[in-house]
Amino acid sequence: MPELIPMQGQPRRELQREHHHGYKLEEVVADLVDNSIDAKADNVWIIFAEETYTNRIDGNYVPKESFFLIAIDDGEGINVDGINKVMNFGAERTYDELDLGKFGVGMKSSSLSQAREVTLISKVKNGQVNLRRLSSEVVMEQDRWTLLPELRPHMKTRAIDIAMARLSERDSGSAIVLEDMHKLKYRVGNESNRDAYLQSEYGHIKDYLSLVFENYIR
């Protein structure tokens, strides 16, 4: 089992609160794009699709259909110490005068409002790929905030494979992978056509990003 990196806080209660925040998906994606701009990225790619995600519940592995979202950039990347700081719930983000920084929710809180599993994968120039995962599965099991520096076998999903492959093609960059997107899974049950639902959500994201980042989008 991978080593666990402990963090501070009151885990289960805080985690449930994070999952129930009312942030819209397009606002969450905008916050991720904002981070990429801060990292001097020239390009940001958003991948939004469906996968079979496996949850570990009471020692049993339970597959279910769910959505994932990946934001990948070609920015400067983050070293392993930086990843630990970014993913720690005690960390705070600061902005200089040129930063957009207008969303005010932070990467961790905004991501957890949409997904139960959040993975940050990053690569600095001439460096190796590092990752940290903030897993609701692990937090609920152990009732403590922890970061996984390696993935459990069932966590090596299609979404992770895509992110790792895209980063391996670049000198540097970062990817945020949101999986087990609980709010979308709940809402999709009322839709007769999943593809239409997916395209509708993607359209909301695209329109919102075009409005917020009009000076950055080509």
What are these model-predicted stretches?
Residues D73:
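Acidic ATP/Mg2+-coordinating residue in the GHKL
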Residues E65:
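Exposed loop/turn and edge beta-strand positions of beta-sandwich/beta-sheet ligand-binding modules
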Residues K85-L100:
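Bergerat-fold ATP-binding/catalytic subdomain of histidine kinases
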Residues D96-R218:
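GHKL-type ATPase core
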Residues G77-N79:
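A short glycine-centered beta->alpha linker in the GHKL/HATPase_c
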Residues M1-D58, V62, D81-N84:
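Bergerat-fold GHKL ATPase/HATPase_c domain
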Residues F48, G90, S122:
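Residues that line or immediately flank small-molecule/substrate-binding pockets and catalytic motifs
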Residues L69-I70, I176:
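Hydrophobic/aromatic residues in the conserved F-box-adjacent beta-strands of the Bergerat ATP-binding
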